[in-house]
């Protein structure tokens, strides 16, 4: 039986063979997007960029709720994607969630080099509410989109709590259970799954594949 990493690897190989360069990965908070991307980097010439790395630095980030539309530096993200498409490499900021008492902040940069660039995030590709409109120019730069669908959106809370617990064990700042609950409720209150995510597989606007988690 193929693992989800095996399936993702084959998907990337097929997309690269089709001449695609920049792919999107949309999956719920705490579902292991960054871990999956890191596994692909071991197996393939894939550069991985998290939408989280494009959060505004402090203190600008304090004007937004982290993770919601508006909290990302879209002009910089657009430039990073354009550089990668043109040159096969780019420089991207690093966002460390354990800084600023768990609120997170930017810390340095890192190179993106590979045959493919995977942009991963919980709302990559999403549409359907006005606050997502500025993001559509970003999504239009994607050659394809993979959706990892949770068995239920109630499972997302548990996954996010586990992710924060792991971050705490590693010595970084982490959100409390109350803060996690508020964050996840805000995420799906602001971007309802039925309105912002269901259309991605029901009425796709770019080549789209999906896997059930």
Regions found by a protein language model. Give the residues of each.
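Extreme N-terminal, non-catalytic leader segments
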Residues: 1-24, 28
